[in-house]
């Protein structure tokens, strides 16, 4: 990983995570029963599978920060209560990032070594992008923290090389320079943004 933008202190970064987790949690709470099997902008993922991914990634990052093995990939992380599973995984992740020294420490992971602050930024951009996916798939307004999306966009622009895109991200899509930060973020990550 490269260096992080240190213009924001750790407590602000952790507060940004709390706001983002809460915003996505609100989207999940408003999913209607008939929407769980609906398609999403993520190929081959239903709304339920997308929420399983969000819960699973919260648990992966929590395990990584505790130097524990991550949960099984592609497992059903939600059981019969996706809303509760997300809420619990978000609270556990938030608590993990609030521990003293977590942001400064370097952690090993499947994509190499990175500081806790860098791990937090990785979690944020994935969380926000999938929050956008979820809002679109369920017809909800996209009400995600714009300042956090802007910071996430700055981070991925510095970190995501073109050779890292295949299999993970599509090519960057065109979007207006004055579009909301969340739209510029998801377009950079390969999602077409209409409008």
Task: Outline where the language-model segments fall.
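Short, surface-exposed helix/turn micro-motifs that flank interaction/cofactor sites
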Residues: 51-52, 131
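Structured surface interface patches that mediate subunit assembly and partner/cofactor docking
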Residues: 2-23, 30-43, 60-195
